[in-house]
Structure formats: C-alpha cells, structure tokens
Amino acid sequence: MNTPEMKAMMQQANQMDKESKKKSKTTTSPIPEITKSEDTYWKNTWASDKDNKLKNWNKGTADLVFNYAYDSRNNDVNYIKVGVIKADGSIELNPKSDVPILQPLHNFKNSNNFFDIHNADSYQYTNETAGFKLNSYILVYQNEQQIGTLTLGNSVKVTRNLLTPGDVYYGDEGYIVSWVYVDEACAINAKEHWTGDLSNTGTPLIVETNVVYALNFKLGWNLVKTEVMGTYEFEDVPEEDRSRYKKHEHTLITSIPNDATYFFRSVGNH
C-alpha cells in the first residue's frame, strides 16, 4: 500500500530512527539499554486515558477517517469519515458507513502489511471474491490535510512496529487492533510454522515462528486483534536487529479490549 499517508509514516519513522542513532555512536549496545528506543516510540505521540481522551491534546477538533483507495491521477486519498477527536482530546470512533471501493478477499496474500506468512499457499479463504479492506490505523485530518494517524492497542511499541516497514518482525509483546470492512460474510484462515536462520555472520541463529489467522468476518465492520506473543531477544546486536517475535495471532474480537489505548502520532510539521 504505497499511498501518501503510508509514505509520510515511513518518512516519520526513518527520521526518528536517524535521530535516535545520532544519540549513540555504538551500534552494538546491549538490548536492555533501550532508552533511545523509548524516546523514538513516544516522540510526537499522544496516548489516551481510561476515558478515551488524549492526554495534553492541543490540536483542536479533527476528523477520523478510514482510507480505502488512492487516486493517483489527482494525488488524492479516498476516505470515509468514521469519527472525531474533540477539542478536549476526547475520541469518538464509530464506523457505520459502507466502504465504496473494495478489493477481493483473495488479494490479501499480496497486500498483507504484517508480512508474517512466508508461503502464500498457507492462506485458506471462504467466499474469496468478497470485497475486503483492512486498516491497522485511522487517519486524522484537519482542513482536508492529514495531521497524523491514530492506532489502537496495549503497547506503544507494537502499535508502531506493526506499521513500520522493517520493524514488523520485532518481538515486543502486545497487540494492535485493525478495522475491517467486508461486503459479504467471508473468512481468512492460515497456520504457518516457519524455521529460519537469521545469521549474517556464519554462525547459525535459528528461530521458529508461528502465525495464526482465524478470521471469520461478518457483513460490514469487524475488529481484528493482532497479538505479538513471545520474544527472541538478541543481546550485543545492532538496535535494528534487537528482537524477533515467536508468534503472531490474528483473531476477531467483538469489542475494544478494556486495556486498549489510542495512540495519536503526528506527521510532517503538525
């Protein structure tokens, strides 16, 4: 999904990584020394409290939108409004509208931004031609301009890692919630056990990962919980290789978990 908003998120992540690395000249610091990563994860980030209100919010009222297509001819993102952030930071998110442009469910194997299935034959679809759209973020707009993204989960790390190319394999534990719209009942199921050698030094570094998709969608809007479970931690390695996940589990949920937090991350100069 090479859309302007994803490009902005990638640019933001790359810039934060560069700033983080400038603070330390060593590239092999032990994993427990993680303060620079904490700074990266929280930079330009607001988190909600138990009342779904972003703490210290100072950006005024903003629209929450679900993007479903990109018009390359007009350099325009197509979206529907699904909620609002009020001036006091209160979040009201309740998708109800139909999504007008969808892709067939079976295309998920080519558009899965979690990149956790190695063999596309692992996917099993029910009603594979049903229209489908999944986003693990909500765009935040003011005056027809994107000012940031809103994610939902129980970890500031996971909600960033799983949206950042190159970081999706990290083993920080927790979950992110995705919003899915389908125009017919359908399903994605997959199970994959993968073993691989991550070493680039000649000394084997074998890991095993397990990935499960158990997604039986009802017509309309659905919530998917993607949980990172178990961690391979690699000490004395560059920060960008500090860990790998042991398991990803993708399941449907009927409501937002009680321990979930909204994370707003600004983009550009906003």
What is the predicted role of each segment?
Residues 1-35, 269-270:
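Sec-dependent signal peptide cleavage junction
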Residues 29-47, 87-93:
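Acidic, serine/threonine-rich, charge-biased low-complexity segments
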Residues 41-76:
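Short, ordered, surface-exposed loop/turn motifs in non-cytosolic proteins
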Residues 96-198:
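Long, low-complexity intrinsically disordered regions in eukaryotic proteins
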Residues 176-270:
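Extracytoplasmic cysteine-anchoring/structural motifs
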Residues 62-64, 81-97:
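Glycine-centered loop-to-beta-strand initiation motif
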Residues 85-86, 172, 256:
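Short, ordered beta-strand-loop transition motifs
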Residues 75-84, 147, 212:
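Local beta-strand/beta-hairpin segments that build beta-sheet-rich folds
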